[in-house]
Amino acid sequence: LFAPNLLLDRNQGKCVEGMVESFDMLLATSSRFRMMNLQGEEFVCLKSIILLNSGVYTFLSSTLKSLEEKDHIHRVLDKITDTLIHLMAKAGLTLQQQHRRLAQLLLILSHIRHMSNKGME
């Protein structure tokens, strides 16, 4: 989905300290996406959630304007979540399958956040 022709060799990461661990985390996450047969639209929704959620609590202070901005961001995040559920329903998943898939996708976000934090170290 991100770069279908990109091939990474785990051994290439050995030249940089900590890179092998990042390769392994990236491989585990991308394998999970493949196993779940993640669709392009779902991937876009997940990327949007990550981008919108990354700064909601850290960059906005407690002024009235920032509280309004936080509320707006939360409404957009709710719409993205609704879109994910709609995509799953459109794919023919039962309600139980939709709930399970949504939970699985949202759980992956914590792994992506962890990888991001590791990359920043």
Curated annotation (Swiss-Prot):
- Got any disulfides in this one, which pairs? none
The source's domain of life comes to Eukaryota
UniProt keyword annotation of Nucleus present: yes
**How this protein is processed and modified after translation, per its record?**
Ubiquitinated; regulated by LATS1 via DCAF1 it leads to ESR1 proteasomal degradation. Deubiquitinated by OTUB1. Ubiquitinated by STUB1/CHIP; in the CA1 hippocampal region following loss of endogenous circulating estradiol (17-beta-estradiol/E2). Ubiquitinated by UBR5, leading to its degradation: UBR5 specifically recognizes and binds ligand-bound ESR1 when it is not associated with coactivators (NCOAs). In presence of NCOAs, the UBR5-degron is not accessible, preventing its ubiquitination and degradation.
Compartments it resides in: Nucleus; Cytoplasm; Golgi apparatus; Cell membrane
Q: Name one GO biological process term.
A: negative regulation of smooth muscle cell apoptotic process
Molecular functions per Gene Ontology: sequence-specific DNA binding; steroid binding; zinc ion binding
In this record, residues modified by a lipid of the kind S-palmitoyl cysteine are 45
Annotated ranges, domain NR LBD: 1-121
Q: Does the keyword Nucleus apply?
A: yes
- What this chain does, per the record? Nuclear hormone receptor. The steroid hormones and their receptors are involved in the regulation of eukaryotic gene expression and affect cellular proliferation and differentiation in target tissues. Ligand-dependent nuclear transactivation involves either direct homodimer binding to a palindromic estrogen response element (ERE) sequence or association with other DNA-binding transcription factors, such as AP-1/c-Jun, c-Fos, ATF-2, Sp1 and Sp3, to mediate ERE-independent signaling.
Q: Which family does it belong to?
A: Belongs to the nuclear hormone receptor family. NR3 subfamily.
Q: State how it assembles.
A: Binds DNA as a homodimer. Can form a heterodimer with ESR2. Interacts with coactivator NCOA5. Interacts with NCOA7; the interaction is ligand-inducible. Interacts with AKAP13, CUEDC2, HEXIM1, KDM5A, MAP1S, PELP1, SMARD1, and UBE1C. Interacts with MUC1; the interaction is stimulated by 7 beta-estradiol (E2) and enhances ERS1-mediated transcription. Interacts with DNTTIP2, and UIMC1. Interacts with KMT2D/MLL2. Interacts with ATAD2; the interaction is enhanced by estradiol. Interacts with KIF18A and LDB1. Interacts with RLIM (via its C-terminus). Interacts with MACROD1.
Query: What name goes with this protein?
Result: Estrogen receptor
Q: Which gene encodes it?
A: ESR1
